[in-house]
A protein has these predicted regions:
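Short Gly/Pro-enriched turn/cap motifs at secondary-structure boundaries
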Residues: 7, 19-20, 53-59, 111-115, ...
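Residue-level recognition of beta-strand termini and adjacent short loop/turns
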Residues: 8-10, 24
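Nucleotide donor/acceptor-binding cores
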Residues: 1, 26, 163-164
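Cysteine-cluster motifs in flexible loop/terminal segments that predominantly coordinate metals
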Residues: 38, 87-131, 135
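Cytochrome P450 core scaffold surrounding the K-helix E-X-X-R motif
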Residues: 40-46
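Residue-level marker of beta-strand positions
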Residues: 61, 81-82, 96, 122, ...
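Glycine-rich beta-strand-centered segment in the early N-terminal region that forms part
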Residues: 20-35, 48-95, 134-136
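Mid-domain Rossmann-like dinucleotide-binding core that forms the NAD(H)/NADP(H) cofactor-binding site
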Residues: 137-204
Length: 204
């Protein structure tokens, strides 16, 4: 298979790599159908991401189609299922993990940052990180699940609810996702940015 590998700032090469294989009972192998390019990917591309080491396959937003599963994972996933991925790799045993705060796991790593990511043709990971998408979800929608999940968490932690005033600083992808969810929850949203184009997009 092919993978786009960041070998140095501003340098990406397409390499041939071995096909991932099902090894564990909870493994899920899927074909990458579409990926997003996040601001952190661009930062890494420019050499400004301090935790990205080269060489690295970037990408942590994707939608894929299941190709093969381990014998335990087949209870939840079947070949042909449309899926997306929760890209955090957690320990499951630290204090935050034990209390449902896996986003701040003491030992967390990220696909596409600390581990190779989705700018490749096939990917394998544990079923814990896989989310099956319902029928009717487009590839574009599936790819945006990860940033919308970030926005949903932000809106919930901010207490966005009917009649509450919420200020969002920054109208990029995450800011816009947060704004849409806050509005859907009934909040009054003020979003700020220094770029007129982003504000226009948020207004639309």
């Amino acid at each position: 298979m092919k993978a786009a590998v960041l070998t140095a700032p501003y340098e990406i090469t397409v390499e041939k790599r071995g096909m991932p294989q099902i090894q564990g009972p909870q493994d899920v192998l899927f074909k990458i159908l579409q990926t997003g390019i996040c601001g952190s990917d661009m930062l890494a591309f420019r050499g400004g991401h301090k935790t990205v080491q080269y060489p690295r396959v970037l990408g942590h937003e994707c939608v894929g189609e299941v190709v093969a599963v381990g014998y335990e994972a087949e209870k939840k996933f079947l070949p042909g299922d449309l899926v997306t991925v929760q890209p955090q790799l957690i320990c499951g045993t630290c204090y935050p993990c034990r209390h449902g705060r896996i986003n701040v796991c003491t030992h967390k790593k990220f696909m596409g940052i600390n581990e190779d990511g989705f700018f490749t043709e096939y990917y394998k990971c544990n079923q814990f990180n896989i989310v099956k998408l319902p029928q009717g979800v487009t590839h574009d929608m599936g790819m945006l699940v990860e940033p919308f999940a970030v926005g949903a968490n932000a809106a919930e932690r901010a207490g966005a609810e009917q009649g509450k005033n919420i200020v969002i600083v920054g109208a990029g992808t995450i800011g816009n996702c947060t704004a849409q969810i806050a509005v859907a929850r009934g909040a009054n949203v003020l979003i700020t940015d220094i770029k007129d184009g982003r504000l226009q997009y948020a207004q639309d």
